[in-house]
């Protein structure tokens, strides 16, 4: 019997043995930095002349790996391989597919610190953030395997006398998984295994900033018994390979995590029916947020300040769930703002390989430039309280930045920055605070810090986000505990790590027999 699901515990790095184990993980990764990695198509390793170079964002001169780069011809080969594999993979027993996930989770668990150390190097994640990313990858495998076992026999429906009706789920076809760089293990693994365990075949196009961890995960799935051709690893340009696969008539669904603009582009392209296409493509998209923490006048203000700082600056604000806006009632505004500034000044920014670092670099030059531009906009729109400096001489480092006294419609209150920047605005009362909280085109996460039960219940009904948290920060959703996904321009309302997520990768079939 399968044990009930429990989320993977986070590592306590105050325990010396855990600290040493993580340091060993860093040594393991250091030893294989700079290697070349192939595409994987039908189990075959394919090297290309053209490469994607993955660098350490904390040290631009350090190459994490050089990864083969797919073009249209190789993408077509991968599509044909996945399409052929679907014919038999879709007929495999759900129990077999679930067992592959259970085994893959066990392999990653044994190599946990190595994977986390790779995230430190490739994504610039500090220890705790990297450890949480790896734990979440394990959680997705454990949770989705169990969910598939629950769904494998379908759902009972009514039958009339002399009639038997069965309602069950079948796979869709070939899925294109386009994964992000900010959770390059967790989200990449979760979106991939959700498609695989439901009986689909996959073309995996990981983010160009973090392709090495995706290759290492493909190796894990192979070791766990995933047959050749079921998962094909094809990093490449979004404009060339991404568009080609989104448009392809044999693509059945696209699972995308990334920016609003790219998500909209994929959604538009996927809607077009191409010659030879015999279905309407399904799009599963998670597209970002502009997330607000509301601080009520009846609130634990220290809890509010701690929650804001952790949610705004964890992983340098590079989470779609990050707090980038604070709406505080005018009665407590100055107190909360001043305490947040105090706490922000205490944060250690630097090399994520050092355990004491709270905040590492941002992902690349393009992100650095964009965030610094938004900081300049913020200086025009509001009052800079702390931070605002950047240094891209060695890596892409930006100081945690707090702006005050913003108009709720200011650009840095409306547009996703995806960096260590948080903006404060005042509300007259709680209704006004909720009105501001709902005034963006997004609807992903939010939090309310309040001791007023009436106001919390009001927020439960009126704060229009997919993940709403009371008296805590707005980041850190745990698989199976906080199904994750938002409204409006935050995506297609899907809930990763929730009980209905796998259904997005299947279609329901009814069979009725008369006797």
From Swiss-Prot:
Give the top-rank taxon of the lineage listed in the UniProt record for this protein. Bacteria
Question: Which residues does the entry assign to the active site, renumbered to this chain?
Answer: 286, 320
Q: Which CDD domains match?
A: ALDH_PutA-P5CDH-RocA (cd07124)
Q: What keywords appear on the UniProt entry?
A: NAD, Oxidoreductase
GO biological process entries = glutamate biosynthetic process; proline catabolic process to glutamate
Annotated EC: 1.2.1.88
Q: Where are the transmembrane segments?
A: none
Which GO terms of the molecular function aspect are on file? 1-pyrroline-5-carboxylate dehydrogenase activity
Q: Which GO terms describe its cellular component?
A: cytoplasmic side of plasma membrane
Q: PROSITE patterns, alphabetically?
A: ALDEHYDE_DEHYDR_CYS, ALDEHYDE_DEHYDR_GLU
Q: Does the keyword Oxidoreductase apply?
A: yes
Against Pfam families, the record matches this protein to: Aldedh
Which pathway, metabolic or otherwise, does it act in? Amino-acid degradation; L-proline degradation into L-glutamate; L-glutamate from L-proline: step 2/2
| Catalytic activity line of the entry | L-glutamate 5-semialdehyde + NAD(+) + H2O = L-glutamate + NADH + 2 H(+)
Is Transferase a UniProt keyword of this protein? no
| Family, similarity comment | Belongs to the aldehyde dehydrogenase family. RocA subfamily.
Database matches in NCBIfam families: D1pyr5carbox2 (TIGR01237), PRK03137.1 (NF002852)
Protein name as catalogued:
1-pyrroline-5-carboxylate dehydrogenase
Q: Which organism is it from?
A: Anoxybacillus flavithermus (strain DSM 21510 / WK1)
Taxonomic classification: Bacteria, Bacillati, Bacillota, Bacilli, Bacillales
């Amino acid at each position: 019997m399968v044990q009930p699901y429990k989320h993977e515990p986070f590592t306590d790095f105050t325990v010396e043995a855990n600290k040493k184990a993580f340091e060993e993980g860093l040594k393991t990764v250091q030893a294989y930095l700079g290697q070349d990695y192939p595409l994987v198509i039908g189990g075959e390793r394919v090297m290309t002349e053209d490469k994607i170079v993955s660098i350490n964002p904390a040290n631009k001169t350090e190459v994490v790996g050089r990864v083969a780069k797919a073009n249209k011809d190789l993408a077509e080969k991968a599509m044909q391989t996945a399409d052929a594999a679907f014919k038999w993979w879709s007929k495999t027993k759900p129990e077999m597919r679930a067992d592959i996930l259970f085994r893959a989770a066990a392999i990653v668990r044994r190599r946990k610190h190595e994977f986390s150390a790779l995230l430190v190097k490739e994504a610039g994640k500090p220890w705790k953030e990297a450890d949480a990313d790896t734990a979440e990858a394990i959680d997705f495998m454990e949770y989705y395997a169990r969910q598939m076992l629950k769904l494998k026999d379908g759902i009972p429906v009514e039958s009339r006398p002399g009639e038997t009706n069965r309602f069950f789920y079948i796979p869709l076809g070939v899925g294109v998984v386009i994964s992000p760089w900010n959770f390059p293990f967790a989200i990449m693994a979760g979106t991939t295994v959700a498609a695989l365990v439901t009986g689909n075949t996959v073309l995996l196009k990981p983010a160009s900033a973090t392709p090495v961890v995706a290759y290492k995960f493909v190796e894990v799935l192979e070791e766990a018994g995933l047959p050749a051709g079921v998962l094909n690893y094809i990093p490449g340009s979004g404009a060339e390979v991404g568009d080609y696969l989104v448009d392809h008539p044999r693509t059945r669904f696209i699972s995308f995590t990334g920016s609003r603009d790219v998500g909209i582009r994929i959604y538009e392209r996927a809607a077009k029916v191409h010659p030879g296409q015999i279905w309407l493509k399904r799009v599963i998209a998670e597209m970002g947020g502009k997330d607000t923490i509301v601080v009520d006048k009846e609130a634990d203000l220290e809890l509010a300040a701690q929650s804001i700082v952790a949610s705004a600056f964890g992983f340098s604000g590079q989470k779609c769930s990050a707090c980038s806006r604070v709406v505080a009632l005018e009665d407590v505004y100055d107190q909360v703002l001043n305490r947040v500034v105090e706490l922000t000044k205490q944060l250690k920014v630097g090399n994520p390989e050092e355990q004491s670092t709270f905040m590492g670099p941002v992902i690349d030059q393009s992100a650095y430039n964009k965030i610094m531009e938004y900081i300049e906009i913020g200086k025009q729109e509001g009052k800079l309280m702390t931070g605002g400096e950047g240094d891209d001489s060695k890596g892409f480092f930006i100081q945690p930045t707090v702006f005050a006294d913003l108009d709720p419609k200011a650009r840095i209150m409306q547009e996703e920055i995806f960096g260590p920047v948080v903006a404060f605005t005042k509300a007259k009362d709680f209704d006004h605070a909720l009105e501001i909280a709902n005034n963006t085109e997004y609807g992903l996460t939010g939090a309310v810090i309040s001791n007023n039960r009436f106001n919390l219940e009001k927020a439960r009904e009126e704060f229009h986000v997919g993940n709403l948290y009371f008296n805590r920060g707005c980041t850190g959703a745990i698989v199976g505990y906080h199904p994750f996904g938002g409204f409006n321009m935050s995506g297609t309302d899907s809930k990763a790590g929730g009980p209905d997520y796998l259904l997005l990768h299947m279609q329901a079939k009814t069979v009725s027999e008369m006797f």
